[in-house]
Amino acid sequence: MTERPALIRKWACIMTVFLFCFVLATRGRAQNQAGSISGTLMDSAGSVLKGAQVSIPAKGLNVSTDEQGRFFFSGLQPGNYTISVSYIGFENLTKTVIVNPGESTAVSLQLQVGSEKQSVLVTAGSASAEVEAVNEERTADNLIQVMPTQTITSLPDRNLGDAISRMASVALTRNEGQANFVALRGGEPRLTNTTVDGFNMPSQDPGIREFDFFSVPPGIVGSVTVSKTLSANKDGDGIGGSIDLVTKTASDTPTYQITAMGGISAMGGFTPIENARPNADIYGTWGRRFGASKKLGFVVGAQYSFDGTGYNDVEPTPDEATLANNQSVPWDDAQDLRTYMFHRPRYGVGGSLDYRIKPGSTIFLRYFYSFTRDSGDKSVYTLFDNTPGAQVINPGNTGCSGTDATTGATAPPCNTPPRYYNQAEDARIYSDSIQLSGTHVLNNTWYSWSAAIGAGYFGDNPFESGNFTNTASTTACQFNQAATKDYYVPQWTPACFSEINSPQNYFFTGTQREPGHEEQINLGLEGSGAFRWHLGGHLSTFEYGGKFRGMHKYNNQYKSNETYAGAGAGIPMTTFRNNLVQPNYYNGAYKDGYNVWFGPVQEYVDQHPTEFTLDNSDKGVDSSNYSLVEHIPAGYVMNTTDFSNGIRLVLGLRAEVTSVNVHNLAFDPNGNATPNKFSGSYYDLLPSASLRFNAGHDSYMRLIYARGVSRPEESELASDVNWGTGGNGAYKNTVSFGNPNLKAETGDDVDVLYEHYFKTFGVFSGGYFFKHLASPPVQTNTVLNNYLPPGAPSIDQGTYLATNYINAGSAWISGVELQYLQHWTNLPGFLSGLGMNANYSYIGSQTSGIAGRSDKPRLLENAPNLFNIGPTYNKGPLSMQMNINYNGSSIYYYQYTDGAPGGPTGPLGDNYNYPHTQVDAQGSYALPRGFKVLVSGLNLTNEEFGFYYGSPKFDTQREFYHPTYSFGLSWTPQHEK
């Protein structure tokens, strides 16, 4: 009972301090009749310019224009002041402004392009967006990359993750043809933090923290900012980096824009399915400001798309066999022949409502919502190798049940016929947030605040499967190594395909469903302030702030199985029609089987309930169920000092305290569940420093150090307790559980960057970074003495071999990053429309502490080579963009252990992503009255997706998603860009 009064006293003290600071600030303002300057910066076309550097050199004051092109100087004594404006691609501007006592002087400034040849940059949407991005990157204190909405939509994308992958040092985790998670600078996706307007977005996926870009349409955000280094006024999450999705804000000029696209996915290459699949995409923005003084602004961006994807997927179970002549050859113990047919709607909305109370004081209400229904059908046949006498190194997967597990020699009975199941994916996936915030600039101080809430959701009936049994008493299905000329297309005997085309042998035996959902709810409250002061005669800004973050994630999914209980083996497959006939399956490499979608079998179950027995006994006591609550209060201080000769030094320190409370279940050897709960806490101190200085004309150097954290996954903290007492060997008692005492992994980052800006618009930057990662979560086995599992009788207390995650080991990441962007407007004639946007990264890494191995492999998802080559053309009414995106091979998950047969490059090696090279292109032609016609091509190279073990010859999955061609029309009033 003493905790509640203590908590009230603590918050009362905090509120008293904030109130005291506010009273002092307002009192100082009343006593000091200083004036201010507020302004808006635009180009000659009337569009606002974001990220411009605006200064009053005589006072040493420097600010950047915000997303509305606005700037504000406060605390100015009455008099004349010369304002200087710098914006790459435009002529510099100076203007003298008179400041009167206690008044705010409003100015509207207009910049002219640097030369007539550069006028293309303000008439082409994607090119002008690049100008905006470069200027914003130049004025930032930390290393950022910015991608405005015009750049995002200048190339075709299925979701926002595809667009982000075109930035430097960005790799994607893909699934079923879609971008899911983003990995920055050689780190795993779990080292990447994602926010919307600075608010930490909850994950939509079960058991992890990573934000899934699968559900986010690309056209609903105003821009994407990737912060590759951290500062004290940002959350400490993000050792790899942080991605901020910035919602749109209303400008002084009304905004109206709409684009509609439609087309087909051409099923060429390896996966001809129904000749073509449809796609559709429509997105737009509407916004304006209201009233004579335009104090109230509103903008909304919305998008709807439909993705019809269909493909064939071959998934072998690779092995290595020794032939009679002692030759070792790749071998397949089994192989899936899969067909996917998806119909995925995706839509979203994002924007803001803002009110300008007065110059320098604005309140925002920002909102973001994205939704995808991951809906589709899957049909799967599994072939088993029934070859006796083969000498394999991984014998557990063959069709020969008499195989000796020690010698690996396959032996009779070899009688496992092909199996079949179908599945419907129907997951609802969404994320949303709403944020109320404000920024208020006083004479020599400013303060800001925000309150936000958001949710991430995955579930309903994400996976529903229909089970079939094959009643054939014999089989002649075997892997045909002699006929396999290409290990990407393993060959099997003709009997295999005769057997999967014998529906009379297959019987439907029931369904498996997973109702329920997993949801994460995030809450954020933040306040910060700053004041100007002088350090040895140099103007400085001291900033301070505090933040509280709360997270609640829970899972209530369960299994619902309906099993056939009637006479006979089941319902004959021939009861259901063949839903898809594919005469050219996988480009003719295989003969397809009889395909039954899940919908008809579920309909049969619903219509004949007496023939099936329902079992959902684990509802409420499923091993996946848990509830996790996490609280993170944080505070920071940061000081920025501007010295002479363009030297700028930023020093900061952030402190974060993390507390975790977990409710889950403990299961005894009989599967009986007992409620369980536990908690843990820790703190982190996160220093940061940034130095920027001139390195020649239009050249700069940056030196940055920062420490970040990556908190453990929810599954590592909250997985169920599972124990047993009937084991063999040294430890009779075993237990596995989540570890709430896990602490955050820390990462120390050092960056060195050189950047040079060209006279004709462009920039080159080259840098080196090094990250040292300490205490990552590692799964291990430990011995617990006198341990009593939760809910166990006292007689079971004793010594247990425990499997769980602990903080152990270390890792490092090191890389070189190069970027080049230029528009060659100085070239003669039609060549002046040419441009290039390219980047390249080489990233190495090494980790240690992995259980069962002494080597030091690369980090997961670390692709050593990444590059983008993006030629552009913008001249007159014609605008064209192309991008070649390359992600090198990377480890998807660790499998290899010391001494495994075949070594690290064999079939028991780590699981790797294939390298990925994708070409996308889009062109537009401007018509009168603001209309444009567009044509685009996505994945023009029909690039493969898949995995392999150890080396590519041990292929385990390989699928193709086909080019997608789209045509459309866009309309934007001519005063908009």
Language model features with spans:
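Transmembrane beta-barrel wall of Gram-negative outer-membrane proteins
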Residues: 274-387, 401, 419, 426-436, ...
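Periplasm-facing N-terminal accessory domains of Gram-negative outer-membrane beta-barrel systems
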Residues: 13, 17-20, 24-130, 140
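A beta-strand signature from Gram-negative outer-membrane beta-barrel systems
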Residues: 167-168, 203, 208, 215-259, ...
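Gram-negative outer-membrane beta-barrel transporters
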Residues: 769-773, 777, 784, 788-896
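Outer-membrane beta-barrel signature, preferentially recognizing the C-terminal barrel domain
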Residues: 416-433, 620, 624-632, 680, ...
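C-terminal beta-signal and adjacent terminal beta-strands/loops
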Residues: 566, 886-900, 913, 924-977
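Periplasmic N-terminal accessory/gating domains of Gram-negative outer-membrane beta-barrel systems
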Residues: 91, 98-107, 119-183, 188-190, ...
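Short loop/turn motifs that connect adjacent beta-strands in outer-membrane beta-barrel proteins
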Residues: 250-255, 290-296, 359-360, 439, ...
